[in-house]
């Protein structure tokens, strides 16, 4: 401080934690079980990862599905498609089957999912209002030559 140091902080929130919608997960698990057998379906439940899908799950019913067929570290330089049939074809069949399940019977399953518990934010405007509130910059320490001020 004696040399006139200042500390300026810029705080920007990262991605939100992913929260897979429970109702959508139940429908997807049922569809996947019919497609590949229930013994091949894992419901990982809640995870600690934060991702752009986490942001979406704040305002929309969301589900981040992982389908086998690759090996290596996700997003790593050793990530490779090792089973194109499972990775590409089974994945596409799963997505289409899930859409069909949600839309059949006048979209009964989709309506049930949409009637689930409240989301973290009622709409995207409320979400962005919070993000803007967290996104800020300020001088944490300011020294005017005689005194230092610390702001929290």
Where is each model-derived feature located?
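Metal-dependent amide/peptide-bond hydrolase catalytic core
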Residues: 1-152
């Amino acid at each position: 401080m004696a040399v006139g140091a200042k500390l300026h902080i810029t705080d920007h929130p990262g991605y939100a934690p992913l929260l897979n919608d429970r109702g959508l997960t139940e429908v997807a698990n049922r569809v996947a079980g019919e497609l590949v057998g229930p013994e091949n379906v894992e419901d990982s439940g809640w995870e600690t990862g934060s991702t752009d899908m986490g942001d979406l799950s704040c305002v929309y019913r969301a589900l981040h599905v992982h389908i086998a067929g690759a090996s290596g570290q996700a997003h790593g330089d050793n990530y490779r498609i090792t089973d194109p049939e499972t990775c590409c074809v089974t994945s596409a069949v799963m997505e289409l089957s899930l859409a069909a399940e949600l839309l059949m019977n006048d979209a009964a399953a989709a309506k049930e999912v949409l009637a689930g518990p409240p989301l973290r934010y009622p709409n995207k405007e409320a979400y962005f209002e919070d993000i803007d509130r967290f996104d800020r910059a300020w001088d944490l320490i300011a020294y005017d030559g005689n005194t230092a001020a610390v702001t929290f």
